[in-house]
Structure formats: structure tokens, C-alpha cells
Regions:
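Helical "substrate-binding/catalytic lid" subdomain
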Residues: 1-79, 85
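C-terminal active-site/capping subdomain that shapes the small-molecule cofactor and substrate pocket
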Residues: 55-127
Length: 127
């Protein structure tokens, strides 16, 4: 039951937290909260609608799906001064690359700052 409820957190409160991280990053780019929500809200709604119609794998897009490691590296550099937002970005990106179709996976993992998440998980389980 606890795992079910923990999983459900990703569908609502943590989705709101993810959008809040996006709003914070947008504010650093000079975009106010109202405008940021006007940009991110429809994007999030369209993504949820796509997932409902097509499933996770077919709805996954952007530089992680394309294997655009240079763009991912630029994102990380832009977020360096905001460690908590950068941590959220890295963690979600690592999970996405591990669980969803991604071109150029090794280069994306390197751009995210390390080797395979699967390998790091295995190492931590040994200790």
C-alpha cells in the first residue's frame, strides 16, 4: 500500500513540484511566474494527453529522446547555480534515459555527469 501511494505522488504533487522547478528555472531566464505557467501548463497538459493516448515510450521527446547530449550538457551548465533544480533535472533525466527509448544513451549519460545509472545502482546495493 505504501508503494502504491508513493507511486501516486508522481501523478499529482510531484508533477506540481516538477512544474515549480520549471517555473523557477524560467524565472532565472527572466520569465515571470504567470508567463512561465502559461508556457509550461499547456505543454504539461499535452504531454499527459499524449501519454494517455500513446503510452510513455511514444510520448517521450526532446533532447533526451533524440540523444542530443550537447543540449543536455548546456542545460546542466545553465542549472549549475541552482543545485536543487539541477538535482531534480539530473535525477529525472537519468530515470528517463534508463526507462524510455533514448538515442545515443551513453553520450546522454556522460552529459548527465556519469556512467550508467544502472551500474551506480548495482554498486550501491552491494554496500
Amino acid at each position: 500500500k505504501a508503494m502504491y501511494h508513493a507511486a501516486a505522488m508522481f501523478g499529482s504533487p510531484l508533477m506540481v513540484a516538477t512544474l515549480a522547478a520549471g517555473v523557477r528555472a524560467m524565472s532565472e531566464a527572466g520569465i515571470g511566474e504567470k508567463e512561465a505557467l502559461a508556457l509550461l501548463g499547456p505543454m504539461a497538459a499535452a504531454t499527459v494527453a499524449n501519454v494517455e493516448k500513446q503510452g510513455l515510450a511514444r510520448s517521450f521527446s526532446g533532447p533526451l529522446a533524440r540523444g542530443d547530449a550537447a543540449t543536455v550538457k548546456l542545460h546542466r551548465e545553465a542549472l549549475e547555480e541552482h543545485p536543487l533544480v539541477a538535482h531534480v533535472y539530473n535525477s529525472l533525466a537519468q530515470l528517463a534515459v534508463r526507462d524510455l527509448p533514448s538515442a545515443n544513451r551513453a553520450a546522454i549519460e556522460a552529459a548527465l555527469g556519469g556512467g550508467s545509472l544502472d551500474n551506480r545502482s548495482r554498486r550501491s546495493k552491494r554496500h
